[in-house]
Amino acid sequence: MPVFNASDWLDECLQAILEQDFQGRMELCVFDDGSTDGSRELVERWRPKFEDRGISVLISGHKSSSPRGVGYAKNQAVSQSSGRFLCFQDADDVMKPQRVRLQQEAAAANPTAIVGCKVCRVPEGSTGRYTRWINSLSAEQLLTQVYTSHGPTVIMPSWFCSRSWFEKVGQFHEGGKGVPEDLLFFYQSLRLGGLVLRVDECLLVYRYHEHAATHSVLEQTIWDLRVDFLQERVLSQWDSFTIWNAGKQGRKLYRSLRPDNQSKVKAFCDVDENKIKKGFYTYEESKERPKPKIPVLHFRNASPPFIVCVKLDMTDGVLEGNLHSLQLTEGVHYYHFN
């Protein structure tokens, strides 16, 4: 558990760890990343309660005025631990009593998996679309929807994995503020053939607040990582494809691709008659002469495979209905990138 100025939430967080119904051996490993609000001392005061329950507590940290970042703090907490399994916990979240038990069972049966869980959001209703997405992905979509702007298909504060798998994937990136260390680790795990699983119960109360480290990561940083991973994992396997969305997001994806993948784009497709009437998209920034012109078609006249650049859960089911009407299989005929 990395900690940075979390005194407002620590009592509730620590009480929940104490109430785990897991019967095996547990240890709590905390790294304090330079808190100035007494967080480290607060954790220290809980030590006797944990030791009474047979849970050893390891606390380390630094007093530097500049935090080293979430990735560094997580790595330090892991390095001082000794367990065969790692349960990641954010200091502002609250685990349900059965979390460690159920996720440990899943990780023991799947030692190369990152195991997540469903979450309950606090305050209720905050980030509604994101929370619905996290909790409703199918087992297949945990692997096919890894390219969307939502990030990892099981959220980092719910992660649980074997120590051996963590060590194989390698540590979290320690670039500090602004680095999506969870996404980088997640992608590396997938590259190595790792599984993604979710225990289908709400095992974590996931708190939304304006100080969360998530807010420090730039959208463009995430975009660049997603585009690179899409090109590496999907587009490298395709000879040609269609971008579903002739609007801003679709054109941005096209412009972000390497030239060899731009040349594979045979068309854009859309439902907007105005865009379709224009007939084509001209890539004005191209150094090629003549400049590339890509046809814009109605989706019914376009051919798969597709990269879909339309936001999920924003069209009242119209997008999903259109994809279904073409009898397409996600992960074969199309991938979401939105």
Swiss-Prot record:
EC number: 2.4.1.-
Keyword NAD on entry: no
Effect of a null allele: Decreased postembryonic growth, characterized by shortened body length.
InterPro entries xrefs: Glyco_trans_2-like, Nucleotide-diphossugar_trans
Enzyme kind, highest EC tier: transferase
Localization per Swiss-Prot or TrEMBL: Cytoplasm
GO cellular component term, pick one: cytoplasm
Keywords of this entry: Cytoplasm, Glycosyltransferase, Transferase
Catalysed reactions listed for this entry: queuosine(34) in tRNA(Tyr) + UDP-alpha-D-galactose = O-5''-beta-D-galactosylqueuosine(34) in tRNA(Tyr) + UDP + H(+)
Transmembrane region(s): none
Keyword Transferase listed: yes
Family matches, as Pfam families: Glycos_transf_2 (PF00535)
An annotated Gene Ontology molecular function: tRNA-queuosine(34) galactosyltransferase activity
Biological processes annotated in GO: regulation of translation; tRNA modification
Domain of life: Eukaryota
Function of the protein: Glycosyltransferase that specifically catalyzes galactosylation of cytoplasmic tRNA(Tyr) modified with queuosine at position 34 (queuosine(34)). Galactosylates the cyclopentene hydroxyl group of queuosine(34) in tRNA(Tyr) to form galactosyl-queuosine(34). Mannosylation of queuosine(34) in tRNA(Tyr) is required to slow-down elongation at cognate codons UAC and suppress stop codon readthrough, thereby regulating protein translation.
Family affiliation: Belongs to the glycosyltransferase 2 family.
Protein name from the UniProt record: Queuosine-tRNA galactosyltransferase
Organism from which the protein derives: Danio rerio (Zebrafish)
